[in-house]
Amino acid sequence: MPIGIFDSGIGGLTVFKEIAASFPKVDLYYLGDTARVPYGNKSKTTIIRYSVECASYLYHNYNVDAIVIACNTASSYALDTLREILPIPVIGVVQPGAESAVKVSKNKKIGVIGTSATIKSNSYFETLKSLDKDLEIYQKACPLFVPLVEEGWIDNEVAKLTVKEYLDDLVKTGIDTLILGCTHYPLLKNTIKGLYPHLNIVDSSVAIVEHLKNIKLNIEETGKRKIFITDESHAFDKLKNMLVGDIKTEKIELSDLCSL
């Protein structure tokens, strides 16, 4: 059972890494839409269109049996559409992340950080409230985090100052749990944890693995790994090598996506 995974860029590799470690014999195909990153400042219509193009490319070209939307923005806006048009399971990152946060929070005060589009969608707020109506939820858009990660600035002084600028006031609300509502953000996890060691940091990529375990997977495959991008990116290659090793990156043309 090959699995297709897509994101707007680098961040979804954090999900790819967790899935690859848990399912070493399952074929994985990853598409990073680096030509159009970030999705977080795009309109809902555009986000859905990009997501349909990426998912359709993986489904039609590699016959994947499940799609993982390794992008919180795309999960927030395009999950229902993809489930309607594709005859295979489609897994987003919002529900797994929300469920994990509810499990680990002791004081029921949960912070959510994400792109402007993800926060505006209220997807985490609504999902969390559906799980526990007594939760106190504090949300914060952190639009500069994605460019930081895409540049590879994940643990330098600029990263620390930017994290503090966004999160100091959020932490003062008394939250004990913080959902990283963007798959780019786990690359800043060590910086965030270093500044706020008392927080439970929720990375939905780990929770996604548990959801995949509920799907019957064909483990008789070769464990093939393929990574595609829509534009050349030195930062992508650098972080790819750090996260998942020396897997060859293949560039595909946007016209190949848009023609589907």
Curated annotation (Swiss-Prot):
Molecular function GO terms recorded: glutamate racemase activity
Taxonomic lineage: Bacteria, Pseudomonadati, Aquificota, Aquificia, Aquificales
Record-stated family: Belongs to the aspartate/glutamate racemases family.
Pfam families to which the protein is assigned, alphabetical: Asp_Glu_race
Protein name as catalogued: Glutamate racemase
Gene designation: murI
Function: Provides the (R)-glutamate required for cell wall biosynthesis.
HAMAP family (alphabetical): Glu_racemase
Superkingdom of the organism of origin: Bacteria
